[in-house]
Swiss-Prot record:
Keyword Transferase: yes
CDD domains hit by this protein: AHBA_syn
GO molecular function terms listed in the Swiss-Prot or TrEMBL record: pyridoxal phosphate binding; UDP-4-amino-4-deoxy-L-arabinose aminotransferase
Signal peptide: none
Family matches, as InterPro entries: ArnB_NH2Trfase, DegT/StrS_aminotransferase, PyrdxlP-dep_Trfase, PyrdxlP-dep_Trfase_major, PyrdxlP-dep_Trfase_small
Protein's name in the database: UDP-4-amino-4-deoxy-L-arabinose--oxoglutarate aminotransferase
Modified residues (N6-(pyridoxal phosphate)lysine): 182
Alphabetized UniProt keyword annotations: Aminotransferase, Antibiotic resistance, Lipid A biosynthesis, Lipid biosynthesis, Lipid metabolism, Lipopolysaccharide biosynthesis, Pyridoxal phosphate, Transferase
Family: Belongs to the DegT/DnrJ/EryC1 family. ArnB subfamily.
Catalyses which reaction(s): UDP-4-amino-4-deoxy-beta-L-arabinose + 2-oxoglutarate = UDP-beta-L-threo-pentopyranos-4-ulose + L-glutamate
Source organism superkingdom: Bacteria
GO cellular component term, pick one: membrane
Length: 379
């Protein structure tokens, strides 16, 4: 048997090593010129006006919610089928996460579900662009505008994703992730884009101790060595080591996503003859970033449960992932919201399985996964 095929592996090369070496030799390794270049590059990529690099997308979500003054007594609408960090940040600020159901086949939160969940206490809506495909963000943003509610796009899966001809994050506020498995990575990191100048200014303060400027800004412009604390803030800045890696990855984005698309197409063709159900694609015009390739493993239909399939793949030297276990089924949220029922979310949470998908995979690697799936389906 070949070596273990992981669910994901970052596509790192000599360019990333050279970028890190350049920063280490520059004498400026924390937040500095590479951060500024990364922020400018994302403004160019998305077409938005402001970009703020942070240490993680979770950090970005935290300070965005804070900047919007979300706290005790407020409600924030979000799908349950998302990474729990969003729910955690809402809860840690004293607000209430209002979890809504998703479309059964795309796993996208719908405008209808969002609007039905709005109350006088709703202060924000957080739609998720899921697995590399976009939610219907125009319709969701229209709801936010109609009710005067902020929309924060969870774009953690969305680098290289386009919706109706525009890159995700072209307007409004969106948060991207550079975590190790994302389409571009710098190990850990994130970035917020926004067209709200006041929000951008608050985010820059909140990410760096509540100061109006950072160390590089003082170094570059000769500002006073002791900056003024304007508001209590956090230490959520991104180092230039990480930013340099992200910049190098961004140059490769088209190539990386093209390879992801080729592997996804290979899976799609093979799955047409198998009982495992891939996600449906959104009906609106889009370019898929193929962050994840997810199948649904229904035991009655497939003759094997999701958990058994993942274990069988592991025995064959193939990794798989679960994106995600529904947040409202996790212990803390289950106890906090014991009567919450989200049928589509729960059905999928029990069946979804993410197959290996990363740019350095070969055609033979994908064939190996397909062969294993055929065997497990009894073919």
């Amino acid at each position: 048997m070949s070596g273990f095929l992981p669910f994901s592996r970052p596509a790192m090369g000599v360019e990333e090593l050279a970028a890190v070496k350049e920063v280490l030799e520059s004498g400026w390794i924390t937040t500095g010129p590479k951060n500024q270049a990364l922020e400018q590059a994302f403004c160019q990529l998305t077409g938005n006006q402001h970009a703020i690099a942070v240490s993680s997308a979770t950090a970005g979500m935290h300070i965005t919610l804070m900047a919007l003054e979300i706290g005790k007594g407020d409600e924030v609408i979000t799908p349950s089928l998302t990474w729990v960090s969003t729910l955690n940040m809402i809860s840690l600020l004293g607000a209430t996460p209002v979890m809504v159901d998703v479309d059964r086949d795309t796993l996208m939160v719908t405008p209808e579900a969002i609007e039905a969940a709005i109350t006088p206490r709703t202060k924000a809506i957080i739609p998720v662009h899921y697995a590399g495909a976009p939610a219907d963000i125009d319709a969701i943003r229209a709801i936010g505008e109609r009710y005067g509610i902020a929309v924060i796009e969870d774009a953690a899966h969305a680098v290289g994703m386009y919706y109706k001809g525009r890159h995700i994050g072209a307007k409004g506020t969106a948060i991207f992730s550079f975590h190790a498995i994302k389409n571009i990575t710098c190990a850990e990191g994130g970035l917020i884009v926004t067209d709200n100048e006041n929000l951008a200014r608050q985010l820059r303060m909140l990410k760096f101790h509540g100061l109006g400027v950072d160390a590089y800004d003082r170094h570059t412009w000769g500002r006073a060595p002791q900056a003024e604390v304007l508001t209590p803030g956090y230490k959520y800045n991104l180092t230039d080591i990480n930013a340099a890696i992200a910049l190098t990855q961004l140059v490769k984005l088209e190539h990386l996503n093209t390879r992801r698309r080729e592997i996804a197409q290979q899976y799609q063709q093979a799955l047409a003859a198998l009982p495992f159900q891939p996600l449906s694609l959104p009906a609106w015009p889009h370019v898929h970033a193929w962050h994840l390739f997810i199948i649904r493993v229904d035991e009655q239909r497939c003759g094997i449960s999701r958990d058994a399939l993942m274990e069988a793949l592991k025995e064959r030297g193939i990794g798989a992932g679960l994106h995600f276990r529904a947040a409202h089924t996790q212990k803390y949220y289950r106890e906090r919201f014991p009567t919450l029922s989200l049928p589509n979310t729960e059905w999928n949470s029990e069946r979804i399985c993410s197959l290996p998908l990363f740019p350095d995979m070969t055609t033979a690697d994908a064939d190996r996964v397909i062969t294993a799936l055929k065997q497990l389906a009894g073919q």
